[in-house]
Regions:
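C-terminal helical/coil "lid" or tail adjacent to the Rossmann-like core of SAM-dependent
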Residues: 1, 176-234
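Conserved alpha-helix/loop element of class I SAM-dependent methyltransferases that forms part
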Residues: 3-23, 38
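Class I SAM-dependent methyltransferase SAM/SAH-binding core
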Residues: 24-79, 102
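A short acidic, Gly/Pro-enriched loop at the edge of an enzyme's catalytic core
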Residues: 77-87
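A short SAM/SAH-binding and catalytic strip from SAM-dependent methyltransferases
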Residues: 86-101, 123
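Helix-to-beta-strand junctions that scaffold the AdoMet/dcAdoMet cofactor pocket
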Residues: 97-98, 111-113
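Conserved catalytic/acceptor-binding region of the Class I
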Residues: 101, 116-189, 206
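Core SAM-dependent methyltransferase catalytic element
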Residues: 175, 243-251
Length: 251
């Protein structure tokens, strides 16, 4: 379901990364393997890494018999790769490192001298209506956070500030760094109930709703339904998502 939501953004990121036939590609945080399969389909030899064994089992099942792909249970920030890659790529997989400066220095060491890096990450929640619109509707019924979270703490939006991303990559030794905006319409579901079910499983609102009592949860969800109902189209519930695509050379 998440792969379906991200299909347009994935296409934009892979187009920017431009994997070539015969290139060795490292897919960081590959999850269930969708981006790895796409790049292998373009002729690249792909090594997908993730820290989730269930997701990797799914990826291996989807790619059974495909000799262009391998999947490793590993943390890309520290794994001793036995090859150097032409391209290190990630779709929403690099914002969770405890020490991003160290992580990107290590990733750079796994890239060939003439190689490159390309990843896509989220802009801030307020710039992502697919989250901020339902989140804003639910907010009056949810508890205030005890403290303002560190916007750069590991998590989906840790790289929302492009200046921070630039500084991390620069310090890691990358060159020709470019950070470009991209956006796409996100299909949350075919109708309101499917969209609500999706939001209950994904995103920051799902975690908060899991912790409140049933009465508040129901009020919050009713408010979300009321907000999403006028947005229904023939294509489903569509709201925009905003990201950065970062690219850089190894040296």
């Amino acid at each position: 379901r998440m792969d379906q939501l991200l299909v347009t953004l994935s296409e934009q990121a892979i187009q920017r990364a431009a994997p070539q036939p015969g290139e060795r590609v490292l897919d960081i945080g590959c999850g269930c393997g969708s981006t790895s399969l796409t790049m292998a389909g373009q002729g690249a030899r792909v090594t997908g890494v993730d820290i989730s064994e269930p997701m990797l089992a799914n990826a291996r099942a989807r790619s059974a018999g495909n000799e262009m792909l391998e999947f490793i249970l590993a943390d890309a920030s520290s794994h001793p790769f036995d090859t150097r890659f032409d391209l290190a790529f990630s779709r929403f997989g690099v914002m969770f490192f405890a020490d991003p400066h160290q992580a990107f220095a290590h990733i750079r060491s796994a890239i060939q001298d003439q190689g490159r890096l390309c990843f896509i990450c989220w802009q801030s929640p307020k710039d992502n209506p697919w989250l901020s619109v339902p989140g804003g509707a639910a907010q009056p019924f949810l508890p205030e956070p005890e403290a303002q979270p560190d916007p750069r703490a590991p998590g989906p939006f840790a790289f929302a500030d492009p200046a921070y991303v630039q500084e991390i990559l620069d310090q890691a030794g990358f060159t020709s760094i470019a950070i470009e905006p991209c956006s796409a319409d996100m299909r949350l579901g075919s109708d309101v109930e499917e969209a609500v079910a999706f939001l209950l499983r994904n995103g920051p609102m799902s975690r908060v709703l899991a912790e409140v009592d049933e009465d508040l949860r129901n009020k919050a969800l009713d408010a979300v339904r009321e907000t999403l109902a006028p947005l229904a189209t023939a294509e489903g519930i569509m709201l925009s998502g905003a990201c950065w695509i970062a690219s850089a050379n190894q040296g």
